[in-house]
Amino acid sequence: MIYGSLDHGFIEVIVGPMFSGKSEELIRRIKRAQIAKQKVQVFKPAIDDRYSIDKVVSHNGTNINAISVVKAFEIIELLEEDTEVIAIDEIQFFDHSIVDVVREIADLGKRVICAGLDMDFRGEPFGPTPDVMAIAESVDKLTAICVKCGNPATRTQRLINGKPAKYDDPIILVGAHETYEARCRKCHEVPRT
């Protein structure tokens, strides 16, 4: 990725299913910016507390400190003037105001790196992610490996008690006992009834 002068702002988006390495890639980009002596601020939605409330944590345990926010506009309120790079994990959990927040920060001449799921467990566009992708200068769509057949996986399979979640189940489950797997288009199952 060639960024050129950052005085005009830049939006990067990292998407894909669970287990595709989105948070790991986000952390890698953050660390590279820090090595280059760029000031970085990292944000995440407060609803994402599966591993830590104040860290972005990948499934393999790699982590970096983050500021947890409830509402997207808090990112602008907490943004420090000399920050050059802003990283936002799990963007799908924010409401659609995250689109305007990301745009506003980029318009300040900042590099904004967002990561999140582009599709929900149904295989449908997830929250504001598609709209953030649309305004980005760069989108990287990562894949995982399908646990059923070994092909590239682009979808997240939700399992409840070992069975595929039904289409009408809630999109976001907080504190539920569900598990997830990476699946390809063919092996992804979402029963309608």
Curated annotation (Swiss-Prot):
Location(s) in or outside the cell: Cytoplasm
Record bears the keyword tRNA-binding: no
GO MF terms held by the record: ATP binding; thymidine kinase activity; zinc ion binding
Pfam families found in the cross-reference section: TK
Active site, per annotation: E90 (proton acceptor)
Residues involved in ATP binding: G16, P17, M18, F19, S20, G21, K22, S23, D89, E90, I91, Q92
Single GO biological process annotation from the record: thymidine metabolic process
Primary localisation category: cytoplasm
Keyword Metal-binding: yes
Binding-site residues, Zn(2+): C146, C149, C184, C187
GO CC annotation: cytosol
Catalyzed chemical reaction(s): thymidine + ATP = dTMP + ADP + H(+)
Keyword annotations: ATP-binding, Cytoplasm, DNA synthesis, Kinase, Metal-binding, Nucleotide-binding, Transferase, Zinc
Enzyme's top EC category: transferase
HAMAP family documented for this protein: Thymidine_kinase
Subunit structure: Homotetramer.
Name of the protein described by the UniProt record: Thymidine kinase
Originating species: Thermoanaerobacter pseudethanolicus (strain ATCC 33223 / 39E) (Clostridium thermohydrosulfuricum)
